[in-house]
């Protein structure tokens, strides 16, 4: 029979790589605990309508990239392509943002998009999401940016990432700007790239995000979104930049930053790097003050961001910021297979009393000679021998594997004290 292989665009995390994920996840939790955000765990399957109403029917994600299917009841379901919509659904369904309540939440888990697989872009990818609800002022904008900045500093990569900012204004501002942009682009229709021509009808603002040099030259003299934004929102954006200056967070303004999801309003931002080739964005977010109401909840201020975990790990690896994994155990037990009922009880007692120790043994229980060979390869500092003689005399044999010391004997009731030293 032919060998089965993994689905294209999906990845296994092998045992030798899992420590990298554990390290990153521990840093994430450390930072988010510091800001008093609470973890939530969301289903990976949602009703398709949720993403049609939030991400947008015309977005690339919904129109080209979602994994959709019908269950046995005929309901249309989707593997989540992003986390914000599901988080908003949870907040509404559980009345977490009613009567002036505020919520500061985070989640981390797999998302699914049918995209062309390449370095840093997979069809199943892990995303950290940070979301805050019920906060109107600038302070929350600064806090979510500071969370990402703190994480990058904790990981030692802050000098390799750049914060880019823009303001999308209100929905009315964007409608007025969209009409002005379409009017400007009319004479250039034949010169636009294929994707931009498609976006003219579906989502004209996404043309600003084009990476095609010819299109960017056409856009150089196009109307600017900032000129269509209300005075109050423009002032808020200016104040946000001033506060970031005071916090020492480096940033640059990017008037073409529009984001690929329809729910964003006001402030939008991305953290980018030049170390990952074309996949330069490692974190992106912004305000989405209308989404809770659009999905059936009360009018609620909201802001959040997402970090692509695989891309972040790639950046950490490329910059040499991940320590080598230490697979060595601390103690290796060498046991007599004929007396396991006694010796295994001793080992398990030590595991319970000293949970910080990494303890291993040869579960095939070969000859003592073969067990000693495995002990030498294990990286353990000591081997503890429990054979028939040791059990008869009440003493375990202690062999030091990394030091030139003579073998010792330690009474079984003193083993824990010995290993604590």
UniProtKB/Swiss-Prot annotation:
Taxonomic classification: Bacteria, Pseudomonadati, Pseudomonadota, Gammaproteobacteria, Thiotrichales
KW Aminoacyl-tRNA synthetase (keyword) present: yes
Stored NCBIfam families: hisS
Any single biological process term in GO: histidyl-tRNA aminoacylation
EC numbers for this chain: 6.1.1.21
Assigned keywords, A-Z: Aminoacyl-tRNA synthetase, ATP-binding, Cytoplasm, Ligase, Nucleotide-binding, Protein biosynthesis
Record's subcellular location: Cytoplasm
Major enzyme class: ligase
InterPro entries linked: aa-tRNA-synth_II (IPR006195), aa-tRNA-synth_II/BPL/LPL (IPR045864), Anticodon-bd (IPR004154), Anticodon-bd_dom_sf (IPR036621), His-tRNA-ligase (IPR015807), HisRS-like_core (IPR041715), HisRS/HisZ (IPR004516)
Family, as annotated: Belongs to the class-II aminoacyl-tRNA synthetase family.
Complex formation: Homodimer.
Any Pfam family matching the protein: HGTP_anticodon
Organism: Francisella tularensis subsp. mediasiatica (strain FSC147)
SUPFAM superfamilies membership: Class II aaRS ABD-related, Class II aaRS and biotin synthetases
GO molecular function: ATP binding; histidine-tRNA ligase activity
Catalysed reactions, as listed in the record: tRNA(His) + L-histidine + ATP = L-histidyl-tRNA(His) + AMP + diphosphate + H(+)
GO cellular component, one term: cytoplasm
Keyword Aminoacyl-tRNA synthetase: yes
Name of the protein described by the UniProt record: Histidine--tRNA ligase
